[in-house]
UniProtKB/Swiss-Prot annotation:
The chain crosses the membrane at residues 22-42, 83-103, 106-126, 132-152, 168-188, 216-236, 252-272, 280-300, 309-329, 342-362, 369-389, 411-431. This is GPI mannosyltransferase 3. GO terms for biological process: GPI anchor biosynthetic process. Disulfide bonds: none annotated. The keyword Iron-sulfur does not apply. Keywords: Endoplasmic reticulum, Glycoprotein, Glycosyltransferase, GPI-anchor biosynthesis, Membrane, Transferase, Transmembrane, Transmembrane helix. It is found in: Endoplasmic reticulum membrane. Its EC number is 2.4.1.-.
Amino acid sequence: MSSATVSRKSLDEARNQRNRSFFLRDIIVIRLINAWWIATFFQPDEFFQSLEPAWNLAFGSQSGAWLTWEWQHQLRTSLHPALFAGVYLVADFISSHILPVGILRATILVAVPQALQAVIAGLGDWYTWQLAVSIYGANSNVSFFALFLQIFNPWQWYCSTRTFSNSLEMTLTVMAMYYWPWELLGVAQTTKENPKPAPILKSLWSLRASLCLAALAVVLRPTNILIWATIVLFTITRISLQGPSPLTLSTVVTLIREAIWCGSLILAISAASDRWYFGFWTFPAYNFLYFNLSKSLAVFYGRSPWHYYFLQGLPLICTTSLPFAVASLYKPTAHATSTQQFNVLKTLAYTVFTTVGALSLITHKEVRFIYPLLPALSILAAPYTASFFTSQPSPTTNNPRPQPQIRNKRYLFVALGVNMFLAGYLSFFHQPAPLNVLAYLRHEYERIHPDSVQLAQTSHFSAMPENEDELFALFLMPCHSTPWRSHLIYPGLRAYALGCEPPLHTEPNTPERDNYRDEADRFYDDPIPFLTSELFSPTKALTVPRYIVGFESIEPWLQEFVQTFEAQSLGLTQVRPVWKGFNGLFNEDWRRSGDMIVWDTGVYDNAPPTKEL
């Protein structure tokens, strides 16, 4: 390597060091805007597997949080909700001193989890770029295309600032990949004087950071072990890789020692957190496998064909970059310029194949489960994207390092247009009603019960009003169709929603399991008998709500129900719409089709005016 090349490389690395902090700031600002613009509902786990247990942890068991069966049976690690519980407490402490009493405090508590998640998402994008820099070079056009693919990816825009455990898992995974010693996939460097390979590990602290972050990702989502098992397997065996291995016995011993220490540290932290949260020693990973595999409860939430990830999952997370991602998986090393780069790219490609292949064997599948692979896919697809959309002019004496020129502009603008359309539609127009209806109910509660609102704020949202037994809202819709206490906020805002707990009391492949119908199923199977004989039966002791919330398709059932003797004996003689929310152009679940409506039952005072539909 010439001195000019070395000098140029040093300048590029110095420039990258200077730009790192500025890029991180700008990326986080983009993700904060991203979080602010997300005004739609996607999946229940965004709230019920993170924010609800976090709310319960921050404000106590009387705060009204909804803990699903997974938390009652310790299937989830407490580390994820503990992160948001901390930000809840900090936000409540600061806002209580700035705004001792005021409805703006509720707005702050709704917003702070998304703000924290935006920072986490920004870190994921930034580390994706830095991992690409470590692979392709500090001044490589390809590195910036990896960042470009992350920033303009509609799936990333739609999901990265949502409080899914998969979103945090994605960031932890790419952070761990960045700190991983990829030089172990390089080639042994020997000399005639010393035929033994030189020490290859550059920094033990980077290795420890990688192992701790990887262990944390595995504790958070046990299936993340597939990614790291693949990387370690190829590092040790070098299957289909080039060049002699730089691994020595001492390096292998160091890897094993550090893996044991770092893994034990994270397991100890996780165990202590779970002991504190649940009140006794438990191992959520075992419980997760026991309930979902041994008792086959995962299939209760849906079955998908074996090819789901190949034909739906990868296209959804890649969208317009899919052709480049497919090409890179077919020939991951086509643009490699060194042996180490060849081996790293091949390992990343095999990581995608192994993870997708293994997860395809599991009956219950969701796109979110392969979300941690997105940074690797962006990095693999970046060379193909860069070569398609840019050309490199030949250097001249006056311009020895010419900037790449954009080409195929028509395709570029079409791809960007499609991405922006998808991101915009999903962010604003696809299922906004579940969030809007809770804001409406919260504001109505603030209007009708100002004393209870003041009590909630002075008690830091941890105390129920003593003499308030009003059922404020009844949700007659598929279970978990809206967020819960993270958006309702006030403990005194009592609400009831149809449940859908799996049949924990049954065994797989039994008539009891096959014929099981949860509460939401029973409502949609036969709505009027369900309402008269089950939901409002004397044994249920459910009071008549102030509001009923549901999708527009249930209105004929409600009108029929209020004509029954059972409803009229409860004082429920009419329902009238007072709020209506647009919920998108389509929905894959027929039960959620159409607008969402709030009906007033007329049994309480201070009712709002009728909403014209």
